[in-house]
Amino acid sequence: MGHKVHPIGIRLGISADWNSKWYANKAEFAGYLAADLKVRQVLRKKMSQAGISKILIERPSNTACVSMHVARPGVVIGKRGEDIEMLRKQVSDIMGVSVHINVIEVRKPELDAQLVAESVAQQLERRIMFRRAMKRSVGNAMRLGALGIKISVAGRLNGAEIARSEWYREGRVPLQTLRADIGYGFSEAHTNYGVTGVKVLIYHGDIFSFSSVGQEKQDDISRGDRNADRSSRRSREVR
C-alpha cells in the first residue's frame, strides 16, 4: 500500500511541513480554511505565467503573511511593484485582515516537482508526444542534481480510445522511507481528447535533521526511554 498514500501527507511533522500555519477555534476554522483555498485559487489563476511552486500562508495576530515560491518573480512584482500591490489588496479583501506578500524565487525550476508537472502538462496541451515530454523533464532534473525522478501521465494518451497510464523513472524514488526528501507535484493537461493527469516525484536526498514537530516527537520518545530506565532501576533496588 506504499504507493496509495500521499507522499507529502505521510511526511508531515517528520521531514515535511504544512503549507498553512495558523490556529483557530471550532467556530473560525471553516472560514479560515475556505479563505486559504480561495486565496490559492485566485493567486494561481492571476499569476499562471509566473510558475507558482507553492503558496505558504501564516496568520499571526490580526495579520496574514503569504509567501509565494515562483520561478519568475518579475511577473508577480510587475513594474515598480504595481502588480504585487494589487494582489495584496485582493488577498486582504478575501482574508479580511492586513496581508503581507513575500515573493521567493525558485532557483532551479527543473528540480521543483510542481513546476515540472506543470511544464509537462503544458507540453501535452501543445500536442507534444508524452514520452518525449517526460524524458526531457527527467533528463533535465537528473542533469541538475536530482537523485531520482518519476513522472506518470494518465488519460487518453495520444488520443487513444481507451485511457491508460504510463510512467518513466530514473534513479531512486524511495517512497516508503520517511526521512527521504521527496517533492510531489500534480497538474492537469486539458487536451482535445479530455483531461490528462500528470504526477511528478523528485528525490533530493535524505533529511537527517528533524523538523520542529518531528524533534518534539523524538524528544518524547527519548524521554519515555529515560523514564523506563528509571522504573527498571527502581524495581531492581526494591528487590
From Swiss-Prot:
GO cellular component terms attached to this protein's record: cytosolic small ribosomal subunit
SUPFAM superfamilies xrefs: Prokaryotic type KH domain (KH-domain type II), Ribosomal protein S3 C-terminal domain
Keywords of this entry: Ribonucleoprotein, Ribosomal protein, RNA-binding, rRNA-binding
InterPro entries registered for this protein in UniProt: KH_dom, KH_dom-like_a/b, KH_dom_type_2, KH_sf_prok-type, Ribosomal_S3_C_sf, Ribosomal_uS3_bac-typ, Ribosomal_uS3_C
Residue span of region Disordered: 217-239
Domain KH type-2: 39-107
SMART domains: KH (SM00322)
GO biological process per UniProt: translation
Alphabetized GO MF terms: mRNA binding; rRNA binding; structural constituent of ribosome
Claim: Nucleotide-binding is one of the keywords in the record: no
Known function: Binds the lower part of the 30S subunit head. Binds mRNA in the 70S ribosome, positioning it for translation.
Oligomer status and interactors: Part of the 30S ribosomal subunit. Forms a tight complex with proteins S10 and S14.
Family: Belongs to the universal ribosomal protein uS3 family.
Protein name (Swiss-Prot/TrEMBL): Small ribosomal subunit protein uS3
Protein's organism: Xylella fastidiosa (strain 9a5c)
